[in-house]
Amino acid sequence: MNIFEHDIQNLSQGNVVAILGSQWGDEGKGKIIDILSKHSDITCRFNGGANAGHTISVNDKKYALHLLPCGILYENNICVLGNGMVVHLKSLINEINSIGGNIIERLYLSDKSHILFDIHQTIDSIQENRKLKEGKQIGTTKRGIGPCYSTKVSRVGIRLGSLKNFEHFKNLYLKLIDNLMELYDIKDYNKEEELESFYKYHLLLKDRIIDVISFMNNRLNEKKNILIEGANAAMLDIDFGTYPYVTSSCTTVGGIFSGLGINHKKLNLTIGVVKSYLTRVGCGPFMTELNNEIGAYLREKGHEYGTTTKRPRRCGWLDIPMLLYVKCINSIDIINLTKLDVLSGLKEILLCVGYRSKGTGELLQKGCYPVDEDAPENYEPVYEQFQGWEEDISNCQTFEELPENAQKYVLAIEKYVDSPIVWIGVGPNRNNTITKK
């Protein structure tokens, strides 16, 4: 059976499937990634670093993953970290050790990905503190992601492939660290201790660092099932997101091809993951935000606290213009709607279906989205109102078992976005997922 028939238990050979966040992250991508990882041969990441996070439950044990793809939890799965990533090796080794077993034998790292050093994290904190004093805080995770991509783009960063020859790596390392210490006036930094750690990483990982481009394209020729796991989400994309309140990598579909080196024609299916309401961590415009008791209700019921930072997430109503904008960019084929159960108990639910200019009164054109920093000053959301439901829906197994008002809400989203909603999350566990025919 073909995956286009949406039977996740029966993937046909040679499928390349991408799972991408369609909002500001934290959509609940981990669950569907975990479900599909069991049926794939290779699971890949193509962007970001340890600023992403999934919490996956397998056999009643929870795993917090920030760098490793979810497929690492399944013995039949090969996992790949692509060249578009920035890798903090200490964090990676800690994740590997937390899972245990011989999982490193199933892990490959691109020789073209960049190494994220502790000094990048130090610089991240310095930059964020400066912006805070200026009232221009971005709200980064302070994991060093932006500074590492900065050294990459400035052509002074160090690729993971350099670690295979340790003496060569050592020379590059000392030059980079000395330059960054001088540039940011960092007085206290233990280079010797970090170099000792990197020698251990060299011994442990030298055979796992490969030419991922060749590896991936050979696997494609072998008709392997490949699952591509997006980190962060479309509205945090460095180009398409709400700049400057974005991450530093390409989080949209184009990042797959530049971050893994695979042919764009090989991608069979793009799954857009959409939370039933909207959340955001950190600063930046959020035009459907609920700074009231409803927002607090969603935060507590949905456990909306960051996997990586533990920061409380801002909550608001679902934004259809945002989804249409993201659909244009990512060419979403089907939707996984998550956390519908969190809306249970609300008397009414609002759905943002458009934006009206505060100046002219005109509606924003379909497919456009106001991503600029001053968007809330220029546009106001247009809402459609839906009646809520009181029932606990976590035990619903079919779409028809959902309360009528819940069905109406889901169908309205499907109508406005014009993409089929195939999976609906109605609870935190893997089996709390409805497949909508």
Curated annotation (Swiss-Prot):
Classification via Pfam families: Adenylsucc_synt (PF00709)
EC identifiers of the protein: 6.3.4.4
GO terms, biological process: 'de novo' AMP biosynthetic process; IMP metabolic process
Record's keyword annotation contains Ligase: yes
Binding site for IMP: 26-29, 51-54, 141, 155, 232, 247, 311
Catalytic activity: IMP + L-aspartate + GTP = N(6)-(1,2-dicarboxyethyl)-AMP + GDP + phosphate + 2 H(+)
Localization (cell): Cytoplasm
InterPro entries membership: Adenylosuccin_syn_GTP-bd (IPR018220), Adenylosuccin_syn_Lys_AS (IPR033128), Adenylosuccinate_synth_dom1 (IPR042109), Adenylosuccinate_synth_dom2 (IPR042110), Adenylosuccinate_synth_dom3 (IPR042111), Adenylosuccinate_synthetase (IPR001114), P-loop_NTPase (IPR027417)
Pathway: Purine metabolism; AMP biosynthesis via de novo pathway; AMP from IMP: step 1/2
Annotated positions binding GTP: 25-31, 53-55, 62, 307, 313, 339-341, 425-427
GO molecular function terms listed in the Swiss-Prot or TrEMBL record: adenylosuccinate synthase activity; GTP binding; magnesium ion binding
Superkingdom of source: Eukaryota
Function, in words: Plays an important role in the salvage pathway for purine nucleotide biosynthesis. Catalyzes the first committed step in the biosynthesis of AMP from IMP.
Subunit structure: Homodimer.
Protein name: Adenylosuccinate synthetase
